[in-house]
């Protein structure tokens, strides 16, 4: 029996029971792990094709050879089947499907309108607040840049409501002309509302109208001899002109569209997505879907579109660079999802063709960079394996480091590096929990490794897969401590290397410990540079995590350190001033004015911060 006959037999047995209906089918292996999710207009007809075909492509034959079980879900129509398929693929990540990796929600710029003093912030997730949402932006950096521009031109507040309500004097943003000081009534409500309305117009792509309004306001102020006010409008016009000249060109005059171009080479694909909203280019993002080398660009694009838009708002127009077989079905499905007509165009001429050509050029360049980096990383892995005589190949390395100051806010950190670079979704930080371990580097390392591998053993495949190599920041002592943990979990064959700095802590003078031996490399050795890079990234992540924990602890504990300040008074002070730092900056009279804080307690608080 051919190996693919196994899956064919499973399908043959199920076929008589399957209704002639649209739906989704799932192929599972002997451990009930989903191998593949597919959709069909007519389930029996689609599944019969697997049985009838004699010469399957390698990927399909391999899938059928591992198929022990078939599951079916019927749907009301083909559009529902398409949506369910995309949802199941994203949820289960079957190994024989095209997979969109690193898909995340995009940031929006949010301008609140729940009160008279609107605030501008960056927003991710559900749009459950009352106000105006602008986006999506391709990255947090693009969204932050837009917020900075709104601050610079329109001087809208970015502080949270608690800080805003309890401000007694303006913050530094007022001093550098990034806020108009509404918290201390330096601007009246009517003028502030005008600024907010103009900011909304600006992000909506109506900057010419704003320029006219600002010019008019400047002239009116000049006529009234209010030159200080006129200078404010003059500065805003100047800032607006600078920003307009630096904004990306939208040659095709796209109002609400995504431009999506795929480029395939050497069995790998990059898909570039450019976001156009309100006639503005709001950046682009590169994706590298996982797929078999023999899958066509059309297949990859179709699968990408459904997975990409499964949890995102869809623009009215999607411009792509390759024909897809199920274009009409995808249009219909996305239109139903949005309750609005969605159009997918393959741009072949005119300005839209120029835009898609630019996106395709970006996709090609991104893919070439990715292939180069992947090949380079593989070479670096091979260099490490050769230097330390590691028999099995390297694809994944975990690096560990600790950070603390005199045993306080102790944190352990783990970072991961794979063939495609640093794997951020596998980064972990460990708050040290065991009393007495906080100041003991060896005990901290043992606790971190114990927690990491204990969970891996308990949860099996549901937690992080085991690495091919562990790298420890430390010397012989750390190596011995880590080895004890690995032996305890039966991981005797998991390679581990410790990297210790020299006596003068100079980079390039590192000593490596492995299996009871010590090694030193030439200062110009690429393997040394690579392992330094891994060590430094783990150190950076540990330090960052420690600082965040320390900052949180400082904010939390400042008021807790004052005798006589219980939870009720603490809450009253924080509600009034917004933060412990604001209490520190307050005068004695300001502290005394807080409800529930009598003169004696106010004096104690003031003296605590100023003695």
UniProtKB/Swiss-Prot annotation:
Swiss-Prot/TrEMBL keywords: Cytoplasm, DNA damage, DNA excision, DNA repair, Excision nuclease, SOS response
Keyword Secreted: no
Location within or outside the cell: Cytoplasm
Protein name according to UniProt: UvrABC system protein C
GO terms of biological process kind: nucleotide-excision repair; SOS response
Family note: Belongs to the UvrC family.
Main location: cytoplasm
Tagged with keyword Transcription: no
One of the Pfam families matching this protein, by short name: HHH_5
Domain UVR: residue ranges: 208-243
Function of the protein: The UvrABC repair system catalyzes the recognition and processing of DNA lesions. UvrC both incises the 5' and 3' sides of the lesion. The N-terminal half is responsible for the 3' incision and the C-terminal half is responsible for the 5' incision.
Organism: Pelagibacter ubique (strain HTCC1062)
Domain GIY-YIG: 20-98
GO cellular component, one term: cytoplasm
InterPro entries per UniProt: GIY-YIG_endonuc, GIY-YIG_endonuc_sf, GIY-YIG_UvrC_Cho, RuvA_2-like, UVR_dom, UVR_dom_sf, UvrABC_protein_C, UvrC
GO molecular function: DNA binding; excinuclease ABC activity
Subunit structure, interactors included: Interacts with UvrB in an incision complex.
């Amino acid at each position: 029996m051919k190996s693919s006959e196994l899956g064919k037999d499973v399908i043959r047995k199920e076929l008589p029971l399957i209704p002639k209906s649209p739906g989704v089918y799932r192929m599972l292996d002997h451990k009930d792990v989903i191998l593949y999710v597919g959709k069909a207009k007519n389930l029996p007809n689609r599944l019969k094709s697997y049985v009838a075909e004699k010469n399957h492509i390698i990927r399909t034959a391999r899938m059928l050879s591992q198929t022990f079980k078939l599951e079916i879900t019927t749907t009301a129509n083909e559009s529902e089947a398409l949506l369910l398929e995309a949802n199941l693929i994203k949820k289960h990540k079957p190994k024989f499907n095209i997979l969109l990796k690193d898909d995340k929600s995009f940031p929006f710029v949010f301008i609140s309108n729940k009160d008279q003093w609107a605030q501008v912030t960056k927003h991710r997730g559900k749009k459950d607040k009352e106000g105006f949402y602008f986006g999506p932006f391709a990255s947090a950096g693009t969204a932050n840049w837009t917020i900075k521009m709104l601050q610079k031109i329109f001087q809208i507040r970015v502080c949270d409501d608690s800080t805003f309500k309890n401000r007694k004097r303006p913050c530094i943003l007022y001093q550098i002309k990034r806020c108009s000081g509404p918290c201390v009534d330096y601007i009246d409500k009517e003028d502030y509302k005008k600024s907010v309305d103009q900011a909304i117009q600006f992000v909506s792509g109506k900057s010419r109208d704003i320029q006219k309004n600002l010019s008019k306001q400047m002239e009116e102020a000049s006529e009234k001899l209010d030159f200080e006010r006129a200078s404010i409008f003059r500065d805003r016009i100047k800032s607006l002109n600078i920003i307009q000249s630096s904004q990306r060109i939208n040659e095709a005059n796209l109002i609400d569209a995504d431009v999506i171009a795929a480029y395939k080479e050497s069995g790998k694909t990059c898909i570039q997505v450019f976001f156009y909203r309100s006639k503005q280019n709001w950046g682009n993002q590169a994706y590298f879907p996982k797929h078999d080398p023999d899958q066509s660009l059309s297949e990859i694009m179709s699968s990408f579109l459904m997975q990409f838009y499964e949890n995102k708002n869809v623009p009215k127009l999607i411009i792509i660079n390759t024909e897809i077989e199920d274009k009409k079905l995808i249009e219909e499905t996305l239109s139903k999802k949005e309750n609005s007509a969605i159009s997918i165009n393959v741009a072949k001429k005119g300005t839209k063709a120029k835009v898609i050509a630019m996106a395709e050029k970006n996709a090609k360049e991104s893919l070439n960079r990715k292939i180069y980096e992947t090949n380079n990383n593989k070479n670096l892995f091979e260099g490490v394996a050769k230097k330390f005589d590691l028999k099995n190949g390297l694809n994944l390395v975990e690096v560990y480091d600790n950070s603390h100051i005199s045993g306080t806010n102790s944190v352990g950190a783990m970072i991961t590096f794979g063939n495609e670079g640093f794997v951020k979704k596998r980064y972990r930080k460990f708050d040290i929990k065991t009393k007495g371990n906080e100041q003991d580097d060896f005990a901290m390392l043992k606790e971190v490794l114990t927690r990491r591998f204990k969970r891996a053993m308990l949860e099996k495949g549901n937690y992080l897969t085991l690495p091919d190599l562990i790298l420890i920041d430390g010397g012989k002592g750390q190596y011995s401590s880590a080895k004890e943990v690995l032996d305890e979990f039966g991981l005797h064959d998991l390679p581990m290397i410790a990297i210790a700095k020299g006596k003068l802590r100079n980079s390039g003078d590192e000593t490596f410990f492995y299996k009871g031996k010590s090694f030193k490399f030439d200062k110009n050795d690429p393997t040394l540079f690579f392992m330094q890079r891994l060590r430094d990234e783990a150190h950076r992540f540990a330090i960052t995590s420690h600082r965040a924990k320390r900052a949180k602890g400082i904010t939390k504990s400042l008021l807790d350190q004052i005798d006589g300040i219980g939870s009720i008074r603490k809450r009253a002070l924080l509600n009034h001033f917004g933060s412990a730092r604001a209490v520190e900056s307050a005068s004695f009279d300001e502290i005394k004015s807080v409800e529930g804080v009598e003169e004696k307690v106010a004096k104690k608080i003031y003296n605590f911060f100023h003695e």
